[in-house]
Amino acid sequence: MAEQDQSRVKEINISQEMKTSFMDYAMSVIVSRALPDVRDGMKPVHRRILYAMNELGMTSDKAYKKSARIVGEVIGKYHPHGDSAVYETMVRMAQDFSYRYMLVDGHGNFGSIDGDAAAAMRYTEARMSKISMELVRDINKDTIDYQDNYDGSEKEPVVMPSRFPNLLVNGASGIAVGMATNIPPHQLGEVIDGVLALSKNPDISVPELMEHIPGPDFPTGAEILGRSGIRKAYQTGRGSITLRAKTEIEEHHGKQRIIVHEIPYQVNKAKLIEKIAELVRDKKIDGITDLRDESDRNGMRIVIEVRKDANANVLLNNLYKQTALQTSFGINLLALVEGQPKVLNLKECLEHYLAHQVIVIRRRTAFELRKAEARAHILEGLRIALDHLDEVISLIRSSQTTEIARNGLMERFELSYEQAQAILDMRLQRLTGLERDKIEAEYKELIERIAELKAILADHEKVLDIIREELLELKEKYNDERKTAISASEDMFEDEDLIPRQNVVITLTHHGYIKRLPISTYRSQKRGGRGIQGMGTNEDDFVQHLFTTNSHHTILFFTNKGKVYRLKGYEIPELGRTAKGIPIINLLQIEQDEYISTIIPIEEFTEDHYLFFMTKDGIAKRTQLSSFANIRRGGLFAINLREGDELHGVRLTNGDKEVIVGTRQGMAIRFHETDVRLMGRTATGVKGISLTGDDHVVGMDIVEDGQDVLIVTEKGFGKRTPIADYRIQTRGGKGIKTCNITEKNGPLVSLKVVSVDHDLMIITASGIIIRLHVKDISVTGRITQGVTLIRVAEGEEVATVARVDIEDDELDEDESIEEERDDRSEVEQGENE
């Protein structure tokens, strides 16, 4: 006995056996379980469920039957797996939130979008849906091949006739060994239009097909952001799209609330609500006062109550980012083509479906032709019998047996076995004249039908015409409205949309320290208060640039080297009111010998606003603001400077302003900005003022009605002169004298346009600072030398002058925010030569 057992033992290589067995298992999973067939869009389990229901007569026009009966039929005859797997698949086929077009018409509890499980199969009932009947239509007309079931006792279809492109219409998902498929559902009418377009133009491109099939259409609706992901998936077979819930913000009793009407595909509504509640509880999202689900049979409605002082749009953007209100859907158009897994693009999916339909129509036509020819053959025999009726009757009466009669008919009239048998089977009522006419009419129709069927088989275009006609009938019968919207924007919000919009004050000191404060910091005191300390600075430092803007506005920083940098308001650190700030070199990639000459806050880069540039050598340039909408992190050149030249200042204009320019030697010129034609960003510019000798520009400003021109000299002298004293000239001239330069007062250091509401900061080369009210400076004539503003010691000189709108050390509501006309506190830094 032991020897006999030993002889049955076979030694094998375990490594080779593992490879072989694993490959067999992998291919079994790929081909027989996890991946859909490109022709009918179904995996074996879906195909078996529908086939079993069709065989059981559970069609859409019949009564519902117990789900357990269907499951038993499937696992008993075709699908040797667990009953739960089959039932769960059938349940999904009956869920309107899982399938774009349900293939099973369920009766009872088939689960919900909240993740509730379906009732047990013994309680629920089902039948085929109307549209699933189109998948099995003509199945009994030899349109498909059959194969043995798992034990060879039954036959099952290899593929369904699938009279509509189910692979794209209902999509598919599945995980095989080493590969996975994830095909989104689509709108039936659009996919049919795509097939029709392909049938008319086999050379059609994927972009042209996308004119008919713009993108997926999910049963839960929602919105697809952008088209690039769709385009990539349709062209390559792989891609990713972003799905966002469909929401609206509505006013209710003076407050806002967010209403969610549709959620992304495959998102569990109950878990989504739990996640939002968890974020609120953990204080990761602020501003939600109430959350409830008001969904009913009329549709979905999730209500998110927003706190009165919260921004609903910012809150919604945070929800998009932190919850499943916005998800991504990875597309992988992987399907079985002739039994092999293949990644397909959109056109290939439709081509394989169309080729399948051509085969189905040709096989159906051939089947109908065989049937028609067989019937015509019988009718030919009946016609012969009717033409020789008396002789036929006599022959039959004289025959002893049916076999003798049949053989006699076959021999006498040269009939086939089938024809002779049909004559013997014919009832006597068929011998009447009326019945004879019916046979003749039927025979004539059959001859015409046979000719028609043969013509179809002989002409490929006729086959395509039939496919087109039947697809159009399906479209008319089952087409509905698209559920999922497709937005043109790739992503409707960025990180900045998660940041509340607020008005802020931004300061930059002479030594390059910058910070941001909420404007409420300066509005917390009552009128007439002493004010608060706005910032802590060193004794030799002061606020040189101070302006109000919005946290979402773009701040442009122009340097003496002609470069421009940009920051968003919220990118500047928010610090306490007494904090010094952080070095601006930590935020901008400026070089060691580079400094900020002008700061301009921009709300929007419009076409009707301009930037006016003035260099140290008197070169002027005017460029559209929109040219600076896209600035790299490392900055870019705003003006092409000549060798040795520097950018003195920049001003924002509306295209209808006047400019005044002052030079070190006391000359000034006033001209209209339109004298400088518009130029590109990289242009050098044109002559704004003619300079003599070693003269250079020390000031440039925009002329405002009712304001004065203020000049400060190297020896600390200064004066105010009415703007009207400076006549308008043409750009490029030498200008007119604005100050009588003497050894006593020295050359000009600064020229600015000021009002009585401004303050003036004057700093000497040794760091001594004095602050003056502009209203305290005398108004004198244009060619006078001015009065002493700051006393400078022998060998000392004024280095820099800054105009300040808001007093930094005594800011309160009355003396700060209201004095910030035009958000303008730009200050140019002069240099002592």
From Swiss-Prot:
List of catalytic residues: Y123 (o-(5'-phospho-dna)-tyrosine intermediate)
Keywords: ATP-binding, Cytoplasm, DNA-binding, Isomerase, Nucleotide-binding, Topoisomerase
CDD domains: TOP4c
Note: Few gyrases are as efficient as E.coli at forming negative supercoils. Not all organisms have 2 type II topoisomerases; in organisms with a single type II topoisomerase this enzyme also has to decatenate newly replicated chromosomes.
InterPro entries: GyrA, GyrA/parC_rep, Gyrase/topoIV_suA_C, Topo_IIA-like_dom_sf, Topo_IIA_A/C_ab, Topo_IIA_A_a_sf, Topo_IIA_dom_A, Type_II_DNA_Topoisomerases
EC category: isomerase
UniProt KW Cell inner membrane keyword: no
GO biological process: DNA topological change; DNA-templated DNA replication
Acidic residues biased stretches: 806-821
Cystine residue pairs: none
Domain of life per record: Bacteria
Quaternary state and interactors: Heterotetramer, composed of two GyrA and two GyrB chains. In the heterotetramer, GyrA contains the active site tyrosine that forms a transient covalent intermediate with DNA, while GyrB binds cofactors and catalyzes ATP hydrolysis.
Protein known as: DNA gyrase subunit A
Pfam families attached to this UniProt entry: DNA_gyraseA_C (PF03989), DNA_topoisoIV (PF00521)
Function: A type II topoisomerase that negatively supercoils closed circular double-stranded (ds) DNA in an ATP-dependent manner to modulate DNA topology and maintain chromosomes in an underwound state. Negative supercoiling favors strand separation, and DNA replication, transcription, recombination and repair, all of which involve strand separation. Also able to catalyze the interconversion of other topological isomers of dsDNA rings, including catenanes and knotted rings. Type II topoisomerases break and join 2 DNA strands simultaneously in an ATP-dependent manner.
Catalyzed chemical reaction(s): ATP-dependent breakage, passage and rejoining of double-stranded DNA
SUPFAM superfamilies reported in the protein's UniProt record: GyrA/ParC C-terminal domain-like, Type II DNA topoisomerase
Domain Topo IIA-type catalytic residues, every copy: 35-498
Subcellular localization(s) per the UniProt record: Cytoplasm
Organism annotation: Halalkalibacterium halodurans (strain ATCC BAA-125 / DSM 18197 / FERM 7344 / JCM 9153 / C-125)
Any GO CC annotation of this UniProt entry: DNA topoisomerase type II (double strand cut, ATP-hydrolyzing) complex
Sequence motif GyrA-box, location on chain: 525-531
Main location as per UniProt: cytoplasm
Similarity remark: Belongs to the type II topoisomerase GyrA/ParC subunit family.
GO molecular function per UniProt: ATP binding; DNA binding; DNA negative supercoiling activity
